[in-house]
Design a protein with these regions (language model features):
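Conserved helix-turn-beta segment immediately C-terminal to the redox Cys motif
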Residues: 24-26, 34, 38-64, 78, ...
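Thiol-based oxidoreductase modules, predominantly thioredoxin-like and allied folds used
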Residues: 55-73, 88-99
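Thiol-/selenol-based redox modules, centered on thioredoxin-like
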Residues: 107, 111-158
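Alpha-helical elements of Rossmann-like donor-binding domains used by nucleotide-donor carbohydrate transfer enzymes
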Residues: 43-46, 76, 104, 108, ...
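Short, internal strand/loop/helix patches
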Residues: 75-123
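Hydrophobic adenine-recognition pocket in adenosine-nucleotide-binding enzymes
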Residues: 31
Length: 158
């Protein structure tokens, strides 16, 4: 199993086939509009402006699982991201990243039986998962680590 095996819904409700990411390094991140870490959107966009394209992608999944910090509709979330941070990387429809209704992408990212790397507890909003060109999970990055952290930039460039 790999990240490329999934099809998700974009923020505007269209199918987004993750197999289109083959050959790209990807950061998968759960996001929220009313979180103390929400300014990381700016760093994510900086990263996307610098590296996004043929070799790198960011996929954001809004989730209301931590502190009810993403209460908005998909339309409201999309407007917030565009207006406040000029987000141009793909944002998906709001999902759950924990619990009984955990989305299948996050089941893959957090369960060793599915990702082959390890079990990863979801800690908070803006937790980042680094996925290689083959759709394999390579690293789980804590929420407080900025997207422009040297270790992430080095991974993108490697």
């Amino acid at each position: 199993m790999s990240l490329h095996d999934f099809t998700v819904k974009s923020i505007d409700g269209k199918d987004f086939d993750l197999s289109q990411l083959k050959g790209k390094k990807v950061i998968v991140v759960n996001v929220a509009s009313e979180c103390g870490l929400t300014p990381q959107y700016e760093n994510l966009q900086e990263l996307y402006d610098q590296f996004g394209g043929e070799k790198f992608e960011i996929i954001a999944f809004p989730a209301n699982d931590f502190g009810a910090q993403e209460p908005g509709t998909n339309e409201e979330i999309n407007g917030f991201c565009s207006k406040n941070y000029g987000v141009s990387f793909p944002v998906m429809s709001k999902i759950s990243v924990i619990g009984d209704d955990q989305h299948e992408v996050y089941q893959f990212l957090t369960q060793q039986a599915k990702n082959g790397l390890g079990d990863h507890e979801m800690l908070w909003n803006f937790q980042k998962f680094l996925v290689d060109e083959n759709g394999e999970l390579v690293r789980n990055v804590p929420p407080q680590t900025l997207p422009i952290d040297e270790s992430i930039i080095n991974w993108i460039n490697s």
